[in-house]
Swiss-Prot record:
<dbReference type="InterPro" id="IPR010982">
    <property type="entry name" value="Lambda_DNA-bd_dom_sf"/>
</dbReference>
<dbReference type="Pfam" id="PF00046">
    <property type="entry name" value="Homeodomain"/>
</dbReference>
<feature type="compositionally biased region" description="Basic and acidic residues">
    <location>
        <begin position="613"/>
        <end position="626"/>
    </location>
</feature>
<protein>
    <recommendedName>
        <fullName>Homeobox protein ceh-38</fullName>
    </recommendedName>
</protein>
<dbReference type="GO" id="GO:0000978">
    <property type="term" value="F:RNA polymerase II cis-regulatory region sequence-specific DNA binding"/>
</dbReference>
<feature type="region of interest" description="Disordered">
    <location>
        <begin position="398"/>
        <end position="428"/>
    </location>
</feature>
<dbReference type="Pfam" id="PF02376">
    <property type="entry name" value="CUT"/>
</dbReference>
<feature type="compositionally biased region" description="Polar residues">
    <location>
        <begin position="167"/>
        <end position="183"/>
    </location>
</feature>
<feature type="compositionally biased region" description="Acidic residues">
    <location>
        <begin position="571"/>
        <end position="604"/>
    </location>
</feature>
<feature type="compositionally biased region" description="Polar residues">
    <location>
        <begin position="190"/>
        <end position="204"/>
    </location>
</feature>
<dbReference type="GO" id="GO:0000981">
    <property type="term" value="F:DNA-binding transcription factor activity, RNA polymerase II-specific"/>
</dbReference>
<comment type="function">
    <text>Probable DNA-binding regulatory protein involved in cell-fate specification.</text>
</comment>
<keyword id="KW-0371">Homeobox</keyword>
<keyword id="KW-0804">Transcription</keyword>
<feature type="compositionally biased region" description="Low complexity">
    <location>
        <begin position="52"/>
        <end position="79"/>
    </location>
</feature>
<dbReference type="InterPro" id="IPR001356">
    <property type="entry name" value="HD"/>
</dbReference>
<feature type="region of interest" description="Disordered">
    <location>
        <begin position="552"/>
        <end position="641"/>
    </location>
</feature>
Length: 641
């Protein structure tokens, strides 16, 4: 350095003033960059360093003239790269600095940002240039970057011992040419979509650029970025026209002691492109997210459930009596069939309704015994336990016992009726009823073969004028009925019959409504009425006999005999009326059932008693013959003769 300055004093005054403002680039990576010029281990640049940059022939001793020629004679350059070599005026404010900046850099070195590295990573230590960002009073500050005089880097020279100026840039840095073009433009035209690198973000003037972005997008600033702008007031400086000036805060002068957080760059970037965040407390909770009460699970595999008590094969249960008892319990305690089917049987309401109407025999059930077993175990429990299993309280049952609510099936029917009334008549498929000929023909064929072929079913359908599906359904239903055997079931000798507790005796009104009980109960009531009438008539005849014996009324030579005669006549008349009524009813039924051809066939088969037509004709003729017994007919006949 001293020899180069001594050689420079031999030139003219113009060159002296220019030399004072211009120093030559010499990089010593092992230096601590403290104002100490007495270091003897400073390493100079190679002799061919400028040859690799500029095509001009430059000698190490004539480095000053090369800088002058590069400045004054750009037209003589044969390479277009010289157009990018702009002079870099250096400030004379630092005469004691050992290392200053120079303008003899290519476009790639010219675009390196003047940025002090505050992070502790090795990216900043490996960069070839560190540009000072402190304020300069030179009028060429905006156009001439200068090399920074580093302060207090401590032992960083140990990491940079063998590095030469031709060391490639770190992978984290972006293209220097694109960064240069970005910084030369107006800061207001910067695009937000570009992702800045750590080096391009904190350049020669990083803070005003971030400040402009914050001002430009202050409507979309997130709370985190607002905190960043408040906490770092040292970076916010006013603008003086196009020239941006700022000073270091006192706490920033020591670059080693004052470090920036690693996430500062991400915060600055997110402040530009971030959108307002939505607080989770403001988001309404969906209805499905609310915690519902745990629903009770009804399972047929739970061993703790009393309804799953095992019933051995040596036990016989009369399913018909059991279904009658279940129907009585449902009616008496106003228990909907849907609830009972779901919570007791774990089945649907339609399955329960079908079982109550047509209970299957116990000995012909295999897997279906489980349903009747749960029914039996439920009936065997006390009333409070039965209602507790159904999740129903006794008070609710007593309050609802006045009028039972309609079951879901009834509600469905009511809804269908209401919709049909509003929407018009609903096309419902009428139920098919076989005629007698069709029924007897199908039954006769079924006795011969229970599984006719498809062709035979088609022939039967064409002959009887039926659909093929109807014929197929008939044979399928007939096979099912034959397997059931008419639901005739009796316990085997080794089975023990489990008695079903019958309903209370006093509840006859409810028993009359339980389907199959209606007909036998009606017959019983009618039989009692006839019995009372017979007793009344017998008592009345005894009183008459007593009165006659005491002398009341006309005496009859044989009162008992006359009474027997009278009673006998009356009984005979009653028998005749009964026979006549029976014959008339039979005749009417025959007329309703079929045509004359069918009647002839039935008479030939002997299925029906002889028709009373002849007797009626004979009676009518007899009546006609007995009509002129008054003598008028004979008198008129004699007069005519």
């Amino acid at each position: 350095m001293e020899s180069s300055r001594t050689a420079a004093t031999s030139t003219n005054g113009t060159e002296k003033s220019r030399r004072r403002n211009t120093d030559y680039l010499q990089i010593d990576p092992s230096s601590t960059f403290i104002n100490n010029t007495g270091r003897g281990f400073a390493e100079e640049l190679p002799e061919n360093f400028l040859d690799t940059i500029s095509p001009h022939p430059i000698t190490p001793s004539a480095s000053t003239s090369s800088a002058t020629s590069a400045t004054e004679e750009p037209a003589t350059s044969s390479a277009p790269q010289l157009a990018s070599l702009a002079p870099m005026s250096m400030s004379s404010e630092q005469p004691s600095s050992s290392f200053s900046s120079a303008s003899l850099l290519s476009s790639s070195y010219e675009t390196i940002k003047n940025e002090p590295e505050f992070s502790g990573s090795t990216a900043g230590l490996l960069s070839p240039l560190h540009v000072d960002s402190r304020r300069r009073e030179s009028h060429d500050f905006n156009t001439s970057p200068y090399i920074k005089e580093e302060e207090d880097l401590d032992g960083s020279h140990l990491l940079m011992g063998g590095i030469r100026p031709d060391t490639p840039t770190n992978d984290r840095s972006t293209d220097l040419g694109s960064i240069s073009s970005l910084l030369n433009e107006d800061h207001h035209t910067n695009t937000i979509g570009q992702s800045p690198s750590p080096r391009s973000t904190f350049g020669s003037d990083p803070t005003p650029m971030i400040q402009r972005q914050l001002i430009k997008n202050e409507d979309g600033v997130s709370p985190g970025s607002m905190g960043f702008s408040k906490n770092h007031q040292g970076y916010q400086k006013p603008r003086n026209g196009d020239r941006m000036e700022y000073e270091k805060a006192p706490y920033q002068r020591n670059s080693r002691k004052q470090k920036k957080p690693l996430g500062l760059l991400n915060q600055a970037l997110s402040s530009v492109i971030s959108t307002p965040t939505i607080s989770s407390s403001n988001i309404p909770t969906p209805p499905s997210a609310h915690i519902a009460q745990p629903r009770r699970i009804y399972s047929t595999q739970d061993s703790n459930d009393p309804l799953n008590a095992e019933i051995g094969d040596d036990i016989y249960i009369d399913t018909k009596d059991l279904c009658k008892r279940i129907a009585f319990e449902l009616k008496n305690h106003s228990i909907p069939q849907a609830i009972f089917a779901e919570r007791i049987l774990c089945r649907s309401q339609g399955t329960l309704s079908d079982l109550l109407r047509n209970p299957k025999p116990w000995n012909k059930l295999k897997s279906g015994r489980e349903t009747f077993r749960r029914m039996y175990n439920w009936v065997a429990q006390p009333l409070a336990t039965r209602l507790a299993i159904l999740d129903m309280k006794t008070e609710d049952v007593n309050r609802a016992s006045g009028m039972s609510p309609p079951t879901p099936a009834q509600n469905v029917r009511t809804h269908r009726r209401s919709t049909s009334d509003h929407d018009g008549p609903v096309s419902k498929r009428p139920r098919l009823v076989f005629t007698d000929i069709q029924k007897r023909t199908l039954q006769a064929i079924f006795k011969e073969t229970q599984r006719p072929s498809r062709e035979m079913q088609q022939t039967i359908a064409e002959h009887l004028r039926l659909d093929l599906s109807t014929v197929a359904n008939f044979f399928m239903n007939a096979r099912r009925r034959s397997r059931l055997g008419g639901n005739i079931d009796e316990p085997t000798p080794f089975q023990q019959v489990k008695n079903i507790s019958p309903p209370p005796v006093g509840d006859t009104s409810d028993a009359l409504l339980n389907g199959d009980d209606h007909v036998p109960l009606l017959n019983t009531v009618m039989a009692e009425m006839y019995k009372e009438g017979a007793i009344a008539t017998s008592n009345h005849s005894a009183e008459q006999r007593e009165m006659i014996e005491r002398g009341f009324g006309v005496s009859i030579p044989g009162p008992s005999h006359s009474g027997e005669l009278l009673n006998g006549d009356s009984h005979e008349d009653d028998e005749e009326l009964d026979e006549l009524n029976d014959s008339e009813l039979a005749y009417e039924e025959d007329v309703e059932i079929g045509d004359e051809e069918e009647e002839d066939e039935e008479q030939a088969n002997g299925d029906i008693l002889p028709t009373p037509k002849v007797e009626e004709l004979e009676e009518k003729t007899v009546i006609k013959e007995e009509a002129p017994d008054d003598g008028e007919y004979g008198a008129t006949k004699l007069a005519a003769n």
